[in-house]
Amino acid sequence: EMATKLVAARLLTAEAARAKESGQRADMLSGMAKLFASETAKEVCEDALRIHGGYGYINEFMVERLYREAPLYIVGEGTNDIQKIVIARRIIDDSEVDVLGLPQ
């Protein structure tokens, strides 16, 4: 489950980068990638800490640092609440955006 979430976060980030590099508007995809990847990082770090048990809190284990730093990704470069607003505005304002792949 943890690996699946991490791969999905990487793929979404790569798709946002591909859109940006090809000159397409990438604000929505970038916001989605940041939102999903930062939430995933926090969830995966929490799971890793549980797996390590008490050792997860010891500075000698990398999971302690990752667990401590993961919430910072949610705040950096615009909080996830701001990312949700960016995504929603793009979907509402642009009729060309077809997020679900449904006929319009």
For each feature predicted by the language model, list its residue ranges.
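Alpha-helical interface subdomain recognition
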Residues: 1-104
